[in-house]
Amino acid sequence: MTGVKLALVAVNTMPEPRQIVADNLARVQDRIHAAAQAAGRDPASIQLVAVSKYVDAATAALLVDAACTTLGESRPQQLWEKAAAPASAGVRWHLVGRLQRNKVRRTLPLVELIHSVDSERLLAAIDETAAALSLAPRVLLEVNCSGEADKQGFSAEDARHLLAKLPTFSNVRVAGLMTMAALEGGEATAHANFAALRKLREELVSMAPPGVELKELSMGMSGDFEAGIAEGATIVRIGSLLFNGLL
């Protein structure tokens, strides 16, 4: 009987999902703040995109309750579903995963930023659709800094070649660059990949046509965002850390 009572007490004292998410968010924000300070940066210069691909719309909405209203999705279909849910009112959505051209029209009206423009053909499709819908979407060019064959994105050389053409895509604001670190190699490799993107951005900015600013660097996820911040990330994309205890 005593054991049963103890078990009941343990169940009754478990934190509610709302509290779990709020506590996880606070820990992540503390780590972002500490990483920024260690790099001599203003923590306010780094935007957290909370990636909700692991959970349903109701659980994702717990982030909004905790005052985190910028959410990201990896798949357009999941973004569409969550954006339509009443619980998602007030969310600013980012698409952080791959976007196929046949999904551009439905996605553009829903998103604040697309992180994953990985080809000139996709950029052209976004530009054409934006003109038809009277939109001016912000996008990032995805660059493959790790050299991994299974990753999407421009090579550094292709990004250089595209730079001069960017003003012709007059309905799209190319706001910066995005990359993902190599899966293997640990922290040192993540630093190297992120440093490569920062240096490429600096190079592109130095020769960019008028009106092309490339201010944003989206780099760093749950396992390597501190390396991203150390190397100059302005946006970090964090998912699983925010839902520890619920997955």
Task: Give the location of each predicted region.
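Conserved alpha/beta-domain cores
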Residues: 3-225, 229-231, 243
